[in-house]
């Protein structure tokens, strides 16, 4: 058994293809696959089980993980650290922070931790996992795969009504003011875009801190824009009827044509395969930074501000309830 790959949101549209690729080409990996609902009543989790059932020699576990509760995330990480220390599972080779949340149809949602839900699920909770689990990586290093999107760049999303700009008061990323005016789609899309911008900027800071550490210098972090996935279930969850209709009658059937105007338009299977290749260092070996699909790319000018990157790094530690020292990394 060569190493453990942790994948959040493992029953997602692209994630199912990530799992399939790993099973087909890296059956020696131990997969820890997290989902919100592990019950048989969840159709998407059953699709994951069906994929796994095709490989009776696969080594895996499907585990529940509610990213909207930081207490649950901390406990999950502690359990995994203990399992690795005890030799019950192999050391980590990769963390794939795939799970995400957005809501374009209702007012701002706050978690019991007091943070806006999109920000917590997409960024804060995944930062907890990464920071708590750094010490469980192999001495040879590994890879952290984070997810951003073209929405981080002002003007690139057709759904954008409010530009994604890091607020002067960083606490507003996690605790934004009420939606004014009450345009749920505009504000929901903006919260999603800001979470992707925060992830991207945190990734740059994370890499700098990893490189300063003799213990973690061989761990590389990437933030990938996986593309606009024409068949993603995300287009049909917490989205207005207009987007759902566009997904069904325009985006999916016309994908080959739309690709001429948007080269990042592709299927979940294409994205999921690329994500798997990144996780095992087949793609872009040793690279740290931003990717569009599997192309090394330059992110938005705003995202490259190193001062703000470090400010987000410090604030994320605070939100996550973790000190740099506890993570074993320089502050």
Predicted regions and their residues:
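Pocket-edge positions in alpha/beta enzyme catalytic cores
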Residues: 65, 118, 263, 301-304
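Rossmann-fold NAD(P)H-dependent dehydrogenase/reductase core
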Residues: 2-233
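C-terminal helix-and-tail extensions that cap enzymatic domains
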Residues: 5, 282-331
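Glycine/proline-rich active-site loop of Rossmann-fold NAD(P)-dependent oxidoreductases
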Residues: 213-217, 234, 238, 282-287
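Alpha-helical membrane-targeting segments
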Residues: 183, 228-267
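Alpha-helical packing segments of well-folded alpha/beta enzyme cores
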Residues: 76, 199-202, 271-275, 312, ...
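C-terminal helical subdomain
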Residues: 251-297, 306-308
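Residues at helix-coil transition
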Residues: 24, 82, 279-283, 321
């Amino acid at each position: 058994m060569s190493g453990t790959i942790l994948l959040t949101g493992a029953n997602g549209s692209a994630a199912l293809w990530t799992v399939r690729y790993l099973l087909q080409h890296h059956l020696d990996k131990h997969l820890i696959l997290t989902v919100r609902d592990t019950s048989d009543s969840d159709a998407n989790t059953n699709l994951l089980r069906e994929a796994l059932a095709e490989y009776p020699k696969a080594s895996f576990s499907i585990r529940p993980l509610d990213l909207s509760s930081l207490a649950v995330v901390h406990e999950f990480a502690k359990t995994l650290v203990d399992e690795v220390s005890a030799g019950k599972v192999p050391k980590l080779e990769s963390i794939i922070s795939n799970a995400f949340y957005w809501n374009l149809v209702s007012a701002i949602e706050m978690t019991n931790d007091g943070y806006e839900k999109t920000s917590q699920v997409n960024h804060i909770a995944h930062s907890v996992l990464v920071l708590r689990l750094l010490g469980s990586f192999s001495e040879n290093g590994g890879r952290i795969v984070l997810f951003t999107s073209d929405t981080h760049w002002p003007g690139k999303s057709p759904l954008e009504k409010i530009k994604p700009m890091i607020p002067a008061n960083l606490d507003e990323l996690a605790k934004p003011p009420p939606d004014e005016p009450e345009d749920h789609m505009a504000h929901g899309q903006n919260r999603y875009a800001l979470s992707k911008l925060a992830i991207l900027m945190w990734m740059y800071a994370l890499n700098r801190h990893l490189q300063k550490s003799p213990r973690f210098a061989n761990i590389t972090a990437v933030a990938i824009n996986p593309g606009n996935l024409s068949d993603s279930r995300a287009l049909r969850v917490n989205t207005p009827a207009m987007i759902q209709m566009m997904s069904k009658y325009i985006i999916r059937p016309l994908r080959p044509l739309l690709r001429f105007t948007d080269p990042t338009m592709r299927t979940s299977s294409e994205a999921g395969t690329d994500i798997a290749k990144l996780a095992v260092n087949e793609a872009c070996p040793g690279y740290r930074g931003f990717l569009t699909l599997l192309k090394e790319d330059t992110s938005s000018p705003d995202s490259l501000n190193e001062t703000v990157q470090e400010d987000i790094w410090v604030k994320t530690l605070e939100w996550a309830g973790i000190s740099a020292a506890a993570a074993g990394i320089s502050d």
